[in-house]
Amino acid sequence: MKSLLITIGVLAVYLSPAQTGNKGDFHNWAPTPPMGWNSWDCFGPTVTEAEVKANADYMASRLRSSGWNYVVVDIRWYVGNDKAHGYNEKDPEYSIDSFGRYLPAVNRFPSAAGGRGFKPLADYLHKKGLKFGIHIMRGVPVIAVKRNLPVKGTKLTANDIYSPADQCRWLHDMYTIVPDKAGAQEYYNSIFELYAAWGLDFVKVDDLSSPIYFTGEVEMIRKAIERTGRPIVLSTSPGETPIDHATHVQQHANMWRTVGDFWDSWRQLKEHFKVFERWNKWRANGAYPDGDMLPLGKIGIRAERGDPRMTNFTRDEQYTLMTLWSIFRSPLMFGGNFPDNDAFTDSLITNKNMLYVLNKSINNRPLFRNEKQAAWIAEDPANGDKFLAVFNIEDREEMIESKAAWKSAVINRQNSSEMIDLKLNGSRKLYLAVSSVENIDWDHADWIDPVLHKGNDTISLTTLKWTKATSGWGKPRVNRSVSGGELIVEGKKYTSGLGVSANSVIEYELPEGIDRFTAMGGLDKAGADQNVGATVRFLVFTEQPSGPEPPASATIDIDLKELGLQSCKVQDLWSGKQLGVFADKFSVKINKHGAGLYRLTAVKK
């Protein structure tokens, strides 16, 4: 492990907190849901200053007038040699100061040289009318503890404030700070004093809210921000935040995660309907349940998971995403690389009617949801008009379990693998399926050493081309995990297998005479190492596992009387078109996985 130690005192700007005349309730710092860009979905832990500036330039010239203004540098900006598809925990080169506070890696952020930190980059953004944000991990750096570095403004050291208990399972840069230890609050004060001096406007604090909600550290962070005198919007991560802490997080943060990492998966998007219903009553001005970043545009360029791609969401699914986020009033943090945006993506995220709903609507609430359709309603406080969002969420049943020739027990961290030995009796079809059990977070699974048997002969399934293959996140991979890493189950590495994420089905045409299939189904290390999710079931089918495909579109009927309307004028907010006057019922045809967003204006008879 290497690190760069910077001595404090290089710049006078670090010597005292930035005073900006901050007054009153911190909720006033985010009067509408924050809108911005975050580097995670496209650059993972490897983003550079040039890439941040390129996205800022695009935002300033094309998007700022629509309300997009936060530019957030995500995880591990203090590591000079991090990597995509995971984290470099083998020999990370940390940049850290003499008080145990991380500093930007100067090989990635050249303007930080000479102890200037992120101030030059923040100044660059501020001159463009933008706001600057960073991601940090909860706690105190492990390297600060190992070096027994002092806590600024005290006679104590990092050793006096830490505990190894409850260390983050998926990244080991930090130790827990024990709230009741002397020096604990002072350490948080010191890092936010530094961030305020840089000109920070937004902080995302990770490993703070799920699966353990660290009440004491949330409160210390809140106090440290208030002490700076600078309005720094606070976002907590990851999710789902335990809902029994909803009141506390609403009273201490501006936004908090309601889900785990959200990627361009329809199954994950569909899950948000349940999640947003659960969290709807906890939204308040300046306090927003967060549906996570928008995996739109070009993502996965050097991501922690996944390959470079334009979003896998169809256009209809993108309309669903933006319609749902706006009617729920979730923060909008764009995950793609702005310079790669196409005209459609820009039009989607700058639609003035959608953004009006996001910023101005009140009394937002679900109207109904069933297996096929959903609807939300809200009001315009300016004139009493209704905002109506409708969604066609119908799917075909992916796996009818009663059809399975074999299925495993629930595979989780306690029971992380199961052997498969199935007689096929000459079947010419084979479907390998993995289903989610409890939720869809980190359901990464591996088919290890999948082998077809024909008498005494064997054929590795990895040598055959599949007919069709799906994965709930990413894409199925041969001899690699779904995230692109090695196949690792229960700590053991394998060279032969298939990596997927639930829900997944891989279909094969088999050679004649195959009488047996063997394999091991196991939870992949990437999922097993997380704090949440990773509960799956393996299934093998010899016939089509799914049900019939739903129609390409469906009519959604809205009883206007249930909305307190007899007759109304309807405007399509996405297109801006006036659709006419409707009495008693409003009916509209919506594409599969698509959405509509409408303004309903009462018409007096």
Q: What residue ranges belong to the model's regions?
A:
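C-terminal beta-strand-rich structural cap/linker in extracellular carbohydrate-active enzymes
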Residues: 582-605
